[in-house]
């Protein structure tokens, strides 16, 4: 009886310990604004400006994407590096290239290429989203 009670008490913990579902599958099916909004409500996606506002990106719906919180942190680190290079005069141009899989509205990766008119790319980083 004690063992049955212990199992009954532990059951919710065991269920809660199940691994998270494969998010890539969810993002592949995130092909509508409603699907993206549902993932954002659950905290699986957060808003990002593809061309960072900090370096002159427009606060415009066409500049918005939805990424994982981890990808947002990576993108912020890239933005910080770009800002430092801009302040040092080492770059004067930024190209942001989001890549999508299928009909998903969530980019699978975002590539940032910062260059200077006098030479090759000074920064070429890819943020993997999913």
Regions found by a protein language model. Name each.
Residues 4-14:
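Sec-dependent N-terminal signal peptides
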């Amino acid at each position: 009886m004690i063992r049955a009670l212990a199992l009954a008490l532990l059951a919710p913990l065991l269920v809660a310990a199940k691994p998270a579902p494969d998010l890539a599958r969810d993002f592949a099916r995130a092909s509508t604004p409603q699907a993206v909004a549902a993932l954002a409500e659950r905290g699986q996606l957060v808003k990002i400006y593809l061309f960072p506002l900090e370096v002159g990106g427009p606060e415009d719906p066409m500049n918005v994407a939805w990424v994982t919180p981890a990808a947002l942190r990576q993108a912020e680190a890239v933005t910080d590096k770009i800002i430092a290079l801009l302040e040092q005069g080492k770059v004067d141009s930024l190209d942001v290239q989001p890549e999508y899989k299928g009909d998903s509205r969530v980019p699978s990766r975002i590539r940032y290429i910062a260059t200077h008119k006098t030479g090759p790319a000074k920064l070429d980083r890819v943020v993997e989203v999913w």
